[in-house]
């Protein structure tokens, strides 16, 4: 590479650490972190801890592009590690502690970390000592002594734009998790997107309750420090703690996932509390009954985010839509975001208006491929676009409608059936809080759709099912009719960390829960 190209590359390849440090220099007394116990840290104090940890890592032999794994609940130290790695150009492998021991071991073995950070809560997880050539640092009093006695790192930031900062693990329907590589460039672009699209500024606080091994927290936790706002750590979804934060701080984005909204509404109903202000809340509106969105936007006097994104893309490509507060009827069509280009692909051609195609994306918020997965990367990034595996339709007004996952089709008698279409019909009934449609073997058709729902009143089960079958007959083509509608407790529905239903586990439940393997 020519010298001029090296110099221009350095000048334009800014790192997350440099932007965070810039905020600390400009606003040293500004609030950066509110920890689990309520302790507060200014940008100046938090930067000092980050620089001291950077020194600790270097003394442990960590170099540019080395991986460090972390297995911990949400806490200050999690973001501290991400920022220290951003400073020295190392990579954080954020391990999903909800995975099985076997899967956790797989993820750690895949990235081959030189060092692993463990909280007390996960010391015994996955028998990590069986993995060779791995050192540990535990979050205990010894860790605090390491930070206290270290000299702050005074060197230049070693990370740059296209360097990988965090590996987030995504779970598919089959096989082991894949490690999505998120660069400094992607995190910076995602922060700028949040500031632009949702008007997040330095006065806001992000309540990081979703696991930090997921983009729902890590993206905006890092983004908040880039923007100059603050992060409040919460160990999981705790309605009482979130209610207190709502009363004390102006919130940037209150993450709310499918499956938890009904309980949160019940908790808030009848309680008196002041709201400092929330810029936006929620996610994945099309997976939630409309009446719940109306209820929560009324309770919190806040609009709801009609999002469509992924670990690989960040909140773009289509999270530009906001559902106004307190409205009862609204569109769930997605609005394309400003920070990426989206095309819908069908048979290697751009799909015609109104026809479904796979969502393919380009833009600065994109990840840099999956760790050690060349064949998958070549396939998913074909023709210079990242193919998401989601089927969508573009409307005449430019909006996008989610159809379903490309990989989950029900093939019935030669016809393709997308579960989401049937689920939307079922969710339109006022008594249905959850609806999942999966495939079941059929002697006649090969596969048929079958529905599993959650309802508020089990005593009315038979009446509700009868009404739903009538609704399906009037709204869906004959071959799309669910062969049966089964009822289950909402708490028994298997979900991913984002709250999305895991259909392959629901299919297993047909056998274990309902003793069904096929339908005539």
For the regions a language model picked out, list residue spans one by one.
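AMP-binding/adenylate-forming catalytic core of the ANL superfamily
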Residues: 99, 116-118, 363, 368-369, ...
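AMP-binding/adenylate-forming catalytic domain of the ANL superfamily
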Residues: 477-498, 517-520
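Conserved AMP-binding/adenylate-forming
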Residues: 229, 281, 288-307, 311-399, ...
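Conserved AMP-binding/adenylate-forming core of the ANL superfamily
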Residues: 12-13, 29-75, 79-83, 100-105, ...
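Conserved pre-ATP/AMP-binding loop-to-beta segment of ANL
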Residues: 28-29, 151-169, 176, 199-205
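Conserved AMP-binding A3 loop
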Residues: 42-44, 165-189
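Conserved structural elements of the adenylate-forming
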Residues: 47-55, 180-201, 213, 261-262
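Conserved AMP-binding/adenylation subdomain of ANL enzymes
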Residues: 188-205, 213-253, 267-268, 337
